[in-house]
Each structure stands twice: as C-alpha cells, then as structure tokens.
Amino acid sequence: KEIITQQYPDERPVIAERFRGEVVLMHDENNEHACTGCTACELACPNGTIKIVTKFDTTPEGKKKKALDTFVYRLEMCTMCNLCVEACPTSAIKMDTAYEHSVFDRNKLTKKLNNEGSKIRSGVE
C-alpha cells in the first residue's frame, strides 16, 4: 500500500503557482514599489481588509501629488478572493504562496506592507 501521509513540517507540500495566499506589496532591490496610493484595491475589497493611508508629496515642479504613506493589510479578515490584485492598475500587489499564518497574538495578523523608507518607483503614474 502506498503511503500518502506527509510528515509536516519535515516534508512541505508543493504549492501550486496559482495558489492564493496573503497579499504582498512587491518591492525591488532599491526598496521601491509601484503603489500610487490610488485606493483601487481598498475599494475593491469586499470586507475592508485593506486600508490605504495617503499623504501629499511635492513634486520638483512644486505640485502636490498623492503618495502612499501606509498600506495596512488585515490578514485575519482576508478571504483571499484576489479582487484587490485584479483592481490594482500598476500591478503593485500580488497574492503570495505563504500558508503558515498561525500566531498567538491576533494583532500580528495586521501588517504594514510597505517597507520603512520605501518610495514609489520612478516612472509609475
């Protein structure tokens, strides 16, 4: 008889490429992201999982421009529906393949997705 039990955590399952895990804001090696703070993902979320806090930066021309201040993601409320990813006009967020989310403190499930000191990638409008 074939053994089908996996000895987790020693044996990890192979995760499918289209698996929907938690939402992540992608940063490059220069700590830059593509989020403009447009709040399209926040509006698309059916249960208020995402909260975008924006600020106004001044451009070199002296104009005020909306920018991302804080990207708050509440994993405990997320249904992994992918609507936020589909709504993002700059493809700044994606669904990760992480599946281990057990914590003793529920507050650890609320995450700030933008890194400290991160800024918008040049050329993203």
Where do the language-model regions lie?
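Non-ligating segments of multi-cofactor redox enzymes
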Residues: K1-M77, L83-E86, T90-E125
